[in-house]
UniProtKB/Swiss-Prot annotation:
Organism: Proteus vulgaris
InterPro entries given in the database record: Small_drug/metabolite_transptr, Small_multidrug_res
Role description: Guanidinium ion exporter. Couples guanidinium export to the proton motive force, exchanging one guanidinium ion for two protons.
Name the record gives this protein: Guanidinium exporter
Recorded topology in the membrane: Multi-pass membrane protein
Gene designation: gdx
């Protein structure tokens, strides 16, 4: 169950990371509320997942999911660069996440 909670926490990290762009420095109310709520719930779920997982593993996977998801969102929605170096770097993060899961 800890792994599922950690995965959902990582997805919520994507929500708040992308949401930061839409808050315009927290000057827009609705995106700011959504972003702050996602931050709180994501970190709460991360904390809960750490009850059953090593802290270093949980944190690394949480940030990895957030980083890869946010980068992919940026490529698809914001038209950010998708060059080979960026894609290979994202793939290495994914393989690192898989490795941490297999090692736990």
């Amino acid at each position: 169950m800890s792994w599922i909670i950690l995965f959902v926490a990582g997805l919520l990290e994507i929500v708040w990371a992308v949401g930061l762009k839409y808050t315009h420095g927290f000057t827009r109310l609705t995106p700011s509320i959504i972003t702050i709520s996602a931050m709180i719930v994501s970190m709460g779920m991360l904390s809960y997942a750490m009850k059953g997982l090593p802290a270093g593993t949980a944190y690394a996977i949480w940030t990895g999911i957030g980083a890869v998801g946010t980068a992919i969102f940026g490529i698809i929605v914001f038209g950010e660069s998708a060059n080979i170096y960026r894609l290979l770097s994202l793939a290495m993060i994914v393989f690192g996440i898989i490795g941490l899961k297999l090692a736990s």
